[in-house]
Amino acid sequence: MGTARFLRAVLLLSVLLMVTFPALLSAEHHDGRVDICRLPSDSGDCLRFFEVWYFDGTTCTKFVYGGYGGNDNRFPTEKACMKRCAKA
């Protein structure tokens, strides 16, 4: 039983890495800097409730941020999000 549980955990971790890793790579510039506008929305680790904005690749979209953690694709207003991420 322990081996089956271990294999399921390894499989789950593999799937999570396959989904997450390409998204992080596509957010990286050629010089290694991360383009925050290409990062996925990330609500963070806490359970507080802040309505903030992230750039979804096309436009700025509202989401709920928990108050701690997450990534830098998070803006206090739609205007700030568009100013940073929208291409002219």
From Swiss-Prot:
Gene Ontology BP, a term: envenomation resulting in negative regulation of voltage-gated potassium channel activity in another organism
Molecular function GO terms recorded: potassium channel regulator activity; serine-type endopeptidase inhibitor activity; toxin activity
Compartment annotation: Secreted
May bind Kv1 (site feature) positions: L39
Propeptide: 28-33
Domain BPTI/Kunitz inhibitor positions: 37-85
Gene3D superfamilies linked: Pancreatic trypsin inhibitor Kunitz domain (4.10.410.10)
Tissue/organ expression: Expressed by the venom gland.
Signal peptide start-end: 1-27
SS bond list: C37-C85, C60-C81
Keyword vocabulary terms for this entry: Disulfide bond, Protease inhibitor, Secreted, Serine protease inhibitor, Signal
Pfam family, any one: Kunitz_BPTI
Marked site: Reactive bond for chymotrypsin: L47, R48
Gene Ontology CC: extracellular space
Family label: Belongs to the venom Kunitz-type family. 03 (sub-Kunitz) subfamily.
Purpose: Serine protease inhibitor that inhibits trypsin at a molar ratio of 1:1.
The protein's name in its UniProt record: Kunitz-type U15-theraphotoxin-Hhn1c
Organism: Cyriopagopus hainanus
